């Protein structure tokens, strides 16, 4: 019985927190809104046209209605900054999503290629980080001077062998990373 009450309290808190943190615009922003500028900002950030609904909801609390025409005009201007190959590449390189469908009036195929090249660089970078982390962990274990639990000769040999394998894998991963970066140079 007590756990049900606790669950209800946590559920109510979660709802309150989610409602309080959802406003896309503050009261002040709604009252002083330049809807074209807001559209430019949203377009430059790759937000979908439907994001205007969130602004409408936020501003309805202070009886302000968005200027849809100005917003959409601004958003189109913002999309000119967002819907470029370099930005698509960056989104992929940083491991973020990139909805090519937002860029209806742009070269979607070229944007998709740029994004995929960025994703490839991101994956190769992730591979390198993973290998580097494992190399570091092995080196720490090899250097550990724990007298209560020293490594056996067999354990040390296995770690040294794995370190050799990882060193080769790292060279190959670095080549793959460099190749992916090279192939993305002309975006």
Where on the chain are the PLM-derived regions?
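Intrinsic-disorder/low-complexity detector
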Residues: 22-187
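Sec-dependent bacterial lipoprotein signal peptides
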Residues: 1-22
């Amino acid at each position: 019985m007590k756990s049900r009450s606790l669950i209800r309290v946590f559920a109510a808190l979660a709802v309150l927190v989610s409602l309080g943190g959802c406003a896309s615009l503050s009261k002040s922003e709604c009252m002083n809104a330049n809807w074209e500028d807001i559209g430019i900002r949203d377009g430059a950030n790759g937000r979908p046209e439907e994001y205007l609904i969130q602004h409408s909801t936020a501003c309805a609390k202070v009886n302000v209605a968005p200027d849809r025409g100005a917003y959409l005009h601004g958003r189109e201007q913002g999309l000119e900054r967002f819907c470029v190959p370099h930005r698509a590449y960056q989104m992929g390189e940083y491991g973020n999503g990139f909805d090519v469908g937002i860029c209806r009036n742009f070269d979607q195929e070229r944007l998709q290629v740029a994004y995929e090249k960025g994703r490839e660089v991101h994956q190769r970078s992730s591979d390198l980080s993973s290998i580097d982390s494992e190399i570091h962990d092995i080196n720490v274990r090899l250097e550990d001077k724990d007298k209560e639990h020293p490594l056996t000769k067999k354990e040390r040999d296995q770690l040294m062998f794995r370190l050799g394998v990882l060193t080769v894998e790292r060279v190959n991963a670095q080549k793959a990373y460099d190749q992916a970066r090279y192939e993305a140079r002309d975006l």
